[in-house]
Design a protein with these regions (language model features):
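Acidic, glycine-rich active-site loops and adjacent beta-strand->loop/helix elements
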Residues: 12, 24-26, 30, 204, ...
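Active-site cavity-forming subdomains of large catalytic enzyme subunits
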Residues: 1-129
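Accessory "access/gating" subregions that flank catalytic or transport cores
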Residues: 112-233
Length: 265
């Protein structure tokens, strides 16, 4: 019903937030438990947060003059028996992942400057002979970020940098490709029908299937977690190089190391 969708929008636009618990669903049969908590207030049952307080849903409906929605055929299944909750969490994580990937490049570029690193591993020619899209994008991003840097352009005595600097295009690039893949899975999912059974009126058929199963998302989320963890791993190794007293930098990046702790911890 249009009123069902409208009431969901009314809740959101008026900061009426249903209380949803973070335990209770496996995702193997849809997000039954969290979605039940999310949509109970539509029918005047359950609890919500409103004006910073936990309230009974029916009292908030009364305050706004809203009648509890009377669900029609199959609306309950459509609201509860799907992957909306895990999809929403995934979209939130994806937005953060895109931002973290960009910030990882910015931080790594500054680290490369501080470590007196070479720009050679970021040149386009070396990316093109192993043309993974994320790797190419990372090389281009670093060339733009470091263009005109006197530290980068000055003469280097060392022939090459440690892996954690030299392999940034490959590692950051692989994470970019992983994020892009997971985003494609999510985009498909949030534009899909995931309840059950599914009605095909044009064919006069009702089919009990398994579109409620969260496996496509679960595998993708594990992939995303691995990819983001790699950004953290390689960043930690660069930090280690920066604080070891190499290339003219003081130990722990502080004057009088030993007396002063600096970035020891």
């Amino acid at each position: 019903q249009v009123i069902t969708v409208q009431r969901i929008l009314d809740f959101f636009n008026n900061d009426v937030m249903p209380i949803v618990y973070d335990r209770g669903s496996l995702g193997a049969s849809g997000d039954l438990a969290p979605l039940a908590n999310l949509f109970l207030p539509l029918i005047g049952v359950g609890d919500v947060y409103y004006k910073g307080k936990k309230c009974e849903a029916i009292s908030v409906l009364d305050e706004f003059g809203w009648e509890p929605v009377k669900l029609m055929s199959k609306e309950g299944l459509a609201l509860l028996n799907g992957t909306q909750f895990m999809s929403a969490n995934g979209v939130f994580a994806m937005l953060k992942a895109f931002r973290l990937s960009k910030k990882a490049d910015l931080i790594a570029a500054l680290s490369l400057e501080a470590f007196d690193g070479r720009i050679d591993p970021f040149m386009d020619c070396i990316q093109q002979i192993r043309p993974h899209q994320g790797q190419i994008e990372t090389g281009e991003a670093f060339r733009k970020l470091l263009a005109g840097s006197e530290l980068i352009e000055r003469h280097k005595d060392h022939v090459q940098d440690p892996y954690s600097f030299r392999c940034i295009p490959q590692v950051h690039g692989a994470t970019k490709d992983a994020i892009r893949y997971v985003a494609s899975v999510l985009l498909t999912e949030i534009n899909s029908v995931t309840d059950n059974p599914t009605i095909f009126p044009d064919e006069d058929r009702i089919i009990s299937g398994g579109n409620f199963h969260g496996q496509p998302l679960a595998i993708s989320y594990d992939f995303l977690a691995i990819a983001l963890a790699e950004l953290g791993n390689i960043s930690e190794r660069r930090v280690s190089q920066l604080i070891m007293g190499l290339r003219g930098l003081p130990e722990f990046l502080v004057a009088n190391p030993g007396l002063n702790s600096g970035f020891m911890i």
